[in-house]
From Swiss-Prot:
Principal localisation: membrane
Xref: InterPro entries: Amino_acid_transport_2, Trp/try_permease_CS, Trp_tyr_transpt
Protein name per the record: Tyrosine-specific transport system
One GO molecular-function entry: aromatic amino acid transmembrane transporter activity
Keyword Transmembrane helix: yes
Stimuli inducing this protein: Repressed by tyrosine and induced by phenylalanine under the control of the regulatory protein TyrR. The promoter region of tyrP contains two adjacent TyrR boxes, which are the targets for the action of TyrR. In the presence of tyrosine and ATP, binding of hexameric TyrR to both TyrR boxes inhibits binding of RNA polymerase (RNAP) to the tyrP promoter and leads to tyrosine-mediated repression of the gene. In the presence of phenylalanine, TyrR binds as a dimer to the upstream box, which enhances the binding of RNAP to the tyrP promoter and leads to phenylalanine-mediated activation.
Membrane-spanning segments: 9-29, 35-55, 81-101, 122-142, 148-168, 184-204, 217-237, 275-295, 308-328, 332-352, 376-396
GO CC terms: plasma membrane
Family the entry assigns: Belongs to the amino acid/polyamine transporter 2 family. Mtr/TnaB/TyrP permease subfamily.
GO biological process, one term: amino acid transmembrane transport
Disulphide linkage map: none
Function of the molecule: Transports tyrosine across the cytoplasmic membrane. The transport system is energized by the proton motive force.
Length: 403
């Protein structure tokens, strides 16, 4: 069980530390480090709390119960439908975000390293064909690729932070370049970067429903990304003053804008290479994990056979919709992450608060109960509504877009 506990911590941390981390400096550039730090700690606490709420609900059902079945038990058919729709939307939005971001970076990498000019569209198509092919072959190949890529990603993250440390200036971290509305606009992107709740049912099953150990799995597993994110913000926001950063992002939108900002301010080929490689690996590992989950979910939903023809059909319905998004909205990486925040707000905030409310009515003498009582459940529910509201205000143009 010790190995399973450690493995589960890494699953939570590995699911969380991914491409969302790359979008954070884009969201934080106009907000400032101190406000970003408050948002990071606040949203981490919120997401960790709701994972513990799900754990409280799971103590009353078999450990291998799916989230949809749990929703049907406590919230009825409509609750099950809302949960299923949110899961589908979340995984499609994330897959689209990762295809968009990875395709852009792949095209840039190939152009830099080979001298052959490649458009972002060609990069998106190439990445989808290769990485999507790996997913279509099956879990064993994904696992093989993911072990190598994740190990390399952690190495490059450490290298990247070490190389950026000498370029950090305290004054950049102390300035407060708060533009009106940007703090609110940054919430969906940072919130999505703490999303691991889709894997909660799998981890509960893997740990055989051991509540005591699962509490530490979710607390430590989500705290590791928090620490990594804080160091990443110190490294990026500390290296580049906000005025320069915002100016560069105006000329070079998206992830390439971040890389361009680091390239111009730090002026070190080693830093640029480390950041670029980490970005590529973060997007690849995030894509493989989410796309595999989406592929298996759709194969089960549409009852596709496990033959070559069946897997190709599942591959088509898995990758064609997000590919179309990536092609028609080539700068949609941050936007797609924000929309994923809508579905994640339902799955990670609204659904857990409702499930816990109903579970406590059905099981008043629960052995494990998260502190906070009903007022905390109301706050969690309202936070879910607020995250969704912020995203729609951004879409309506009433709040500024980030990145």
């Amino acid at each position: 069980m010790k190995n399973r506990t450690l493995g589960s911590v890494f699953i939570v941390a590995g699911t969380t530390i991914g491409a969302g981390m790359l979008a954070m400096p884009l969201a934080a550039a106009g907000v400032g480090f101190s406000v970003t730090l408050i948002l990071l700690i606040g949203l981490w606490a919120l997401m960790c709390y709701t994972a513990l709420l799900l754990l409280e609900v799971y103590q009353h059902v078999p450990a291998d119960t799916g989230l949809g079945t749990l929703a049907k038990r406590y919230l009825g058919r409509y609750g099950q439908w809302l949960t299923g729709f949110s899961m589908m939307f979340l995984m499609y939005a994330l897959t689209a975000a990762y295809i968009s971001g990875a395709g852009e970076l792949l095209a840039s990498s190939i152009s830099d390293w080979t001298g052959i000019s490649m458009s972002a569209t060609a990069g998106v198509l190439l990445f989808t064909f290769v990485a999507g092919g790996v997913v279509c072959v099956g879990t064993s190949l994904v696992d093989l690729f993911n072990r190598f890529l994740f190990s390399a990603k952690i190495i490059f993250l450490v290298v990247m932070l070490v190389l950026l440390l000498p370029h950090i200036h305290k004054v950049n971290l102390l300035t407060l370049p708060l533009q009106q509305g940007l703090a609110l606009s940054a919430i969906p992107v940072i919130f999505t970067s703490f999303g691991f709740h889709g894997s909660v049912p799998s981890i509960v099953s893997y740990m055989d429903g051991n509540i005591r150990k699962l509490r530490w799995v979710f607390i430590i597993g989500s705290a590791i990304p928090l620490v990594a994110y804080i160091f990443w913000q110190v490294a990026t926001l500390g290296s580049i003053d906000s005025t320069t950063f915002m100016g560069l992002l105006a000329n070079h939108a998206g992830l390439n804008g971040l890389l361009q900002a680091l390239r111009e301010m730090v002026a070190s080929p080693h830093v640029e290479l480390a950041v670029h490689l980490f970005a590529d690996l973060a997007l690849a590992t995030s894509f493989l994990g989410v796309a595999l989950g989406l592929f298996d979910y759709l194969a089960d939903l549409f009852q596709r056979s496990n033959t070559v023809g069946g897997r190709l059909q599942t591959g088509a319905i898995t990758f064609l919709p997000p590919l179309a998004f990536a092609l028609f909205y080539p700068r949609g990486f941050v936007m797609a992450l924000g929309y994923a925040g809508v579905a994640l707000a339902v799955l990670a905030l609204i659904i857990p608060s409702l499930l816990t409310w109903q579970s406590r009515k059905h099981n008043p003498q629960a052995g494990y109960r998260v502190k906070g009582g009903r007022p905390a459940l109301v706050v969690v529910f309202l936070c879910g509504i607020a995250v969704i509201g912020v995203q729609f205000l951004i879409a309506a143009g009433l709040l500024p877009e980030v990145g």
